[in-house]
Amino acid sequence: MPNYCDYEMKIKGSKEAIARVLECLNADYNYGEGKPSHKHFFRVFDATKDGNARKNADGTYTQLIYGYCAWSVSSCMLDGGFSYYQSVKKDHPEIFMGTTLAEQSEDCEIEVFSEEPGMGFSEHYIFKNGECLCDDECEITSGGYDESGKPTEDIDWDTYEGETLIFNPYRFGRTQQFLWNI
């Protein structure tokens, strides 16, 4: 069983582009049963829309999606050396229907923040016009809060306050509410 990776994704583009990415996130496939019916990411277990897409001033739409996948966004939605994309493409080249965030961003912008607490890392990606504009990964840090509720500097992972582990979700210089770039 894999460690789960929680992600939050923002898609900006046409309603059709948003629907296409959602279809890839929610796709049901089994290469043991033959060719999948459409493009898909790998081992995405949940992709839930945060309400309806919101219309932007420029006529595009923005949709937030929350979900979880196996191990990392990198292994499930990208085409790197240790990705499901590469291994399935190698094992089933004749019926392969996998896709990546880069491929799906040809006519939209996609930004993803993820967190995998089992191995203690977080990811941040931005894709636009098929290009990766941001590929960041960092360790999940822990910290405390001062009396005003602002985060203090990072403290050791094993720091406890009484019986409570102090965990600080502040990484990539952002607060719990992600500072979206798209």
Listing of model-derived features with the role each one plays in the protein:
Residues A27, H38-I182:
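Charged interaction segments
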Residues M1-Y31, N181-I182:
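Short, extreme N-terminal segment that most often corresponds to the first beta-strand
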